[in-house]
């Protein structure tokens, strides 16, 4: 009996050591919460809010929220956002899927232990290959935007225009992208072209 308990304990420790268990638990929970417990959001451009709090496991050596945690929390918020507005469901019906192709983060103020915050996510627009989303980390203590993240959500197997048309049952013109986002898109394109040249690949070879 003792041997079995030791084996189970060792197995549990190995699972936690080799897998990001809490990520694998929280991500489906975020999807289920968005799908079953929250109302559908019909406006694709509406801002959605995802609550959070800085836990001891989120801290770095300076007792601030670790920079990597911002991307992680934004991941949960973005999946919940795409679930509530129907984009993930539409992709499933169209037999397509999406991958994160690019991201950038601007940190304005640290989030500290036990500080409550919201991740406010909104769709900024789209082009012929990807959706562009923004996530703001807002402290609930004073409303300060502590971090601003941008994401390029690339679609495989379909186009953003077709997904939006599938959801709205009509053709919808994409909103004009903010100037700073357009600069970021240009940077990504220039970076892709430079990397293709360094690798000896032709312009026909596309990345995400």
Swiss-Prot record:
Gene3D superfamilies: Hotdog Thioesterase
Any single Pfam family the record assigns to this protein: 4HBT_2
Location(s) in or outside the cell: Secreted
Signal peptide as annotated in the record: 1-17
SUPFAM superfamilies in the record: Thioesterase/thiol ester dehydrase-isomerase (SSF54637)
Alphabetized InterPro entries for the sequence: HotDog_dom_sf, THEM6_lcsJ_thioesterase
GO CC field: extracellular region
Modified residues (Phosphoserine): 199
Keywords from the named record: Phosphoprotein, Secreted, Signal
Entry annotated with the keyword Phosphoprotein: yes
Superkingdom assignment: Eukaryota
Protein family according to the UniProt entry: Belongs to the THEM6 family.
Protein known as: Protein THEM6
Taxonomic classification: Eukaryota, Metazoa, Chordata, Craniata, Vertebrata
